[in-house]
Amino acid sequence: MQGSAKMAMAVAVAVARVWRPSRGLGRTGLPLLRLLGARGLARFHPHRWQQQQHFSSLDDKPQFPGASAEFIDKLEFIQPNVISGIPIYRVMDRQGQIINPSEDPHLPQEKVLKFYKSMTLLNTMDRILYESQRQGRISFYMTNYGEEGTHVGSAAALDDTDLVFGQYREAGVLMYRDYPLELFMAQCYGNVSDLGKGRQMPVHYGCRERHFVTISSPLATQIPQAVGAAYAAKRANANRVVICYFGEGAASEGDAHAGFNFAATLECPIIFFCRNNGYAISTPTSEQYRGDGIAARGPGYGILSIRVDGNDVFAVYNATKEARRRAVAENQPFLIEAMTYRIGHHSTSDDSSAYRSVDEVNYWDKQDHPISRLRHHLQSRGWWDDEQEKAWRKQSRKKVMEAFEQAERKLKPNPSLIFSDVYQEMPAQLRKQQESLARHLQTYGEHYPLDHFEK
């Protein structure tokens, strides 16, 4: 090994010694990391360095380090439209029948029923909270109509300790992990039971106990963050995977490129899960990209990729299960593109009738809904019937309404809490601001709805 390689190895070892998952890089580690640089860490692998030293002058094959390819003597550009589209993997047809028995996950009845109940409970919660926003009871909401299969199928394939980075339409992942309805409601109402203490707008859930990182609004910021978490898990030999959800619109953000490239070069155990639901707010996929969707981008980064039918909960489950197994065993990233359709409006601030037809929405709602497909499957196996359906619909609505009414009665957190949790110990400047707010409210309190807030 040459001197420069030895030096790089020494610096890498020094960084590894000072880095601990529990306390970060520390004062010594940060300067070392800056000295080495992210590119140096990413590209330096002793075994690769040794392999790249074998040059041959006996043939006329390309020796460029940037790609593995052959020379050609004809000028020819690669035409994107002559490359076949990546196929869509599915297990069930639209009537809920297994197409290829060898792909049947052979899940027990209890687990498949949990799939169905999680999906329908989410659907019921969506309807009630959407209407509550329309009535002015909460400020904002985003439904998950039509995408329930992507949430539940992927969540069921993960271990409970796998870390989840969501975008803002993955409530079903938390639902499957038995996140209480009361906490869903508390977050949307921003009341005293909200884990975030009322600081986030509705649907921005987070729960440390369920290993679900709090959602942030800016598009795609979670992608490089998730890669960093996966890299840390790899270094700590945590034997877990990180899954990062995003939409096809977020995949157009620069953070997606950065995340994909870092995950590939750092060989991180991460699953990139793209919900391609047809629209990024009002932008259709035909205006979002010109290539073959999102899965086609994976190979260009060196990421194993697959496209699945997102309305087939078993296809989503199988793909995520295998990606999880291999990501942990092989320390490499995977990209899953789940093809689905956003039946609801983008949010309560959107009217999708302005950019798509009612017939289009009705087709997906009536003809290819993930809940209907799974119900057909359950009924064909004798695991579900109309009476059970009727009873469960009534029971699930009652559960949601009870949590809803409980959340509505609770007070908002004390306004002074906006200054807490910023630092471990509140500095003098922040304490001064807190005291200033208290004086202001004491003087002008009659102008604020303080009766709705905890004292």
Curated annotation (Swiss-Prot):
Keyword set includes Secreted: no
Record's protein name: 2-oxoisovalerate dehydrogenase subunit alpha, mitochondrial
Post-translational modifications: Phosphorylated at Ser-347 by BCKDK and dephosphorylated by protein phosphatase PPM1K.
Purpose of the protein: Together with BCKDHB forms the heterotetrameric E1 subunit of the mitochondrial branched-chain alpha-ketoacid dehydrogenase (BCKD) complex. The BCKD complex catalyzes the multi-step oxidative decarboxylation of alpha-ketoacids derived from the branched-chain amino-acids valine, leucine and isoleucine producing CO2 and acyl-CoA which is subsequently utilized to produce energy. The E1 subunit catalyzes the first step with the decarboxylation of the alpha-ketoacid forming an enzyme-product intermediate.
PANTHER family registered for this protein in UniProt: 2-OXOISOVALERATE DEHYDROGENASE SUBUNIT ALPHA, MITOCHONDRIAL (PTHR43380:SF1)
Stored Gene3D superfamilies: 3.40.50.970
Lineage of the species this protein comes from: Eukaryota, Metazoa, Chordata, Craniata, Vertebrata
Molecular functions (GO terms): 3-methyl-2-oxobutanoate dehydrogenase (2-methylpropanoyl-transferring) activity; metal ion binding
